[in-house]
């Protein structure tokens, strides 16, 4: 028999009345009713009410009264039925209580810095410093149990489809592509460093070259990048997947049902879109102003550049003639809104970098108003209504700028309008694939990879040799859910000549590619199958399912937005002897010192 417990704290019911039991757990609540003391004893599984009567054992009663909340105790007692008026139907044990005759304190708790039942109401820094208390809160614990269940379902889904689970190395070589690496100095090889992997990219491609047909892992990834609400600094986990002899559609046909089934299982009363529509990157930027569209928002942006090119509204007409664009953002049922509504949108647009924000209102009595309307003919107004999908009672806002900037600005205005007008569909998960990403982009006047340098360009070597680099699209794809990117993937470039050509266009010689990615280029010389993969983010998926405001709420021991572990005190200084052993010396710049001190 276990000396600490005969039952768990969720197990007792009326069938146990009269039994002698042993329970262990934390003191969750105490209620002192004069000569009777009630204690809610909590373990991982549930809560059982304990009762102590001063008239039965005054010494035990006084001792129990003195013990602090969250102390760990072991009790022995007799199960008794509660009186009818004290039954608690919200507890599985709510029909019984345990009359305690023995109580041992296993570990006494100090005065609590946070109130466990409502720990999520405390400042985040305090919660993270005392995360071991925060994790005892039911709401926080339920997020972690959801995380465990989601990962378990991911494993089952992949194994049922014939994928094998692999663990790739944590200590590897630094890569020049992507985010900043976390470096680990080598003691044995002075002056050299390992890197923590940003993703298992190279290793999973090498597994395909090794003949492992279908692979997955719940992969830890490490990137030295700033935090966002949907991104934790330091590390994150992804369901990393790779397959041999597949096309883009093959990857979609595997991953789409996996994600749909997982979301359906854990969505509760929320709906899940039955299909994942395909939206090209180009269309996403035009229609939604972002490559991460929230399809719960029904507003669709339209291009109305041609209308204004032929109009008398010189500000827009001359801009379009110089190569700028005009985007229209509908605002349904707002034509009768006060002037302050429109002025606030203009001010918002200016704050995010727009030179201004034009608008037209189409009243239900067919009156057309707004600072732009008087410059347009009836035909032009009708064309705008058709292109923007607006009618009587609606309004439409206009952004004019270079195409990329106009997309960014109109996307932000679309998001604001969707929220303020309460247009965002509630209690649903809306997915889409974003496809046909540009292969290249210009950064600081130089050609660079826009997404994944190891993806296959559509059109292969011919496209790289004969097309405008900015017109080349790749077999790259994202999955977006409710405006959050939850996965990226690609069909990989498995042909060495195409790889060398692609890298040469961004300034790498074949020798430089071999030096940086030698393991991969060596493998490409010995027979590599066509292959592709995808990597849904575990943390973001759980964050969406848990419906929490930031990703730290679903990570057991997260870093702060400044990349600090307040519980463990990391990052921390190390002593000089350790640095000497690693052949390292510190040279902290004034700029870095300022960041540290702040």
Curated annotation (Swiss-Prot):
Single GO biological process annotation from the record: aspartyl-tRNA aminoacylation
Ligand binding (L-aspartate): 177, 223, 451, 492
Key word Cell cycle present: no
Chain intervals for the UniProt region annotation (Aspartate): 201-204
Site description Important for tRNA non-discrimination, residues in chain: 33
Record function comment: Aspartyl-tRNA synthetase with relaxed tRNA specificity since it is able to aspartylate not only its cognate tRNA(Asp) but also tRNA(Asn). Reaction proceeds in two steps: L-aspartate is first activated by ATP to form Asp-AMP and then transferred to the acceptor end of tRNA(Asp/Asn).
The protein's name in its UniProt record: Aspartate--tRNA(Asp/Asn) ligase
Native source species: Anaplasma phagocytophilum (strain HZ)
